[in-house]
Structure formats: C-alpha cells, structure tokens
Amino acid sequence: MNLSGKTVLLLAPKFFGYELEIKKELENLGARVIYFDERPKNDFFTKVFIRLNLKSFISKKIDDYYKNIIQEIKDESIDFLFLIAPETVSIETIKQIKSIHKNIKIISYFWDSIKNKKTALEYLNISDKYFSFDSNDIKIDKKIQFLPLFYI
C-alpha cells in the first residue's frame, strides 16, 4: 500500500513500543503520521477506570485530552484516522474529527477479542474499515474483517 502524500492520525495505546513500530511502518509506506496515545494518561488508576469502563470517573480528563488533540489537528489535512484498540476516544470525538476532516477514512483495529472489550462494537458503524485479530470476531458482523497479529 502506498501512502505517499497521505496524513494518518494514529490513536493507539502505548503498549510495549508497538505503537512506535506501527507509526514507523506507516511512515515507511510514505505516510506522514501524527500520533497520540489513545489514553489521556497511563497511570494505574486511569488504566483501571478505562478497562472497567468506568470512564465517567475521569470523563473531564478524557474530554480535555481530546479537545486538545482536536485543537492541535484542526489545521491539518488528515486522510486517515487509524484507531488501534480504542477504549477511550468517544464516538462523539470521532464525529468531531470527521466534521473537521470531511474526507477522512476511519480504520479500527482490535488486537484483543471483541468479547474482552466492552466498547469495541461501538466503533463498528463509524469505521470505514474494522479489523480484529480474532477470527471468531468476524462471525459477529459481516463488516468485521480478520487481520492476524503482526510481529516485531
């Protein structure tokens, strides 16, 4: 795939450097990549609240974090929003990004089974492409495509 001249907004959790390897590979394909951690913070409590879907306890922190991101990217010309294992970014935030970047294509990838991610299916309808590493997930909806894990 040639991404020459394209800009990718990458929202992915910091996870053993995978996000940096993915960013580097997108750049090797020619893309300009703007990366932000999908989580507003990586401390223990933030991770617990997100993982247990108790985001209401940190909703102000999440809202402020994404307002800052939207402010930072508003003047960019973004072609793709690449969401990896999204848990924190709200559908409303994605809609705001899409309203600014009208032609943006949204790609979601889950490297954990959908059954383990309570909010995973929320991203299905807003995504142009939706991938899971779990071959069982493709049975949930015809829009879900199988994409095995990568290795570094």
Give the location of each predicted region.
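Catalytic core of nucleotide-activated saccharide and alditol-phosphate transferases
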Residues: 96-152
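N-terminal pre-catalytic "stem/leader" segment of glycosyltransferase-like enzymes
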Residues: 1-111, 123, 129
